[in-house]
Amino acid sequence: SPKSLFIKDIQIYKLDKTKILFYEENKVSYIIKSLKSSLLNNNKDIKLEGNVRLYDLNNKANTINANKAFWNIDKYEFTLIGDVILNNNSIKVESSKAILNKKENIIKFFKPVKYRYLNNSSDLNYKVKADNAYYDLNKQNLLFESKNARIKSNLNF
């Protein structure tokens, strides 16, 4: 961060233009950027705000955008809140909230979920609406779930 401020009374670091690198086996696997962030609870929690972007370096096509994100450093879960969008070369998934579980490498998108298949070489237009969706980063597959309502699909040729 190019600018940081430590507030001693409440033990919080405030940072601007944050860039966080996540390592797995001494190799960068994710990069997270935001306009500002705070280190809370004796540096155990990170709160990111403003144009939060997560880049998956294991699959460079995957990017996730959100308004805010929270991460407890001791846990494997990263919570994204507000206008959450997963993009890659073939899909776009949108929801108001998502949780990335790093241990399982699965992203759970919460109600309401909108999905769109992206393929520029085809006239196929495929849309799905569901309560929840689960995206497996390793297998690159997507599972939809609705508890009380039917999953709505729309195919246009």
Describe each region flagged by the PLM.
Residues 1-157:
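Mature-chain termini and adjacent capping regions
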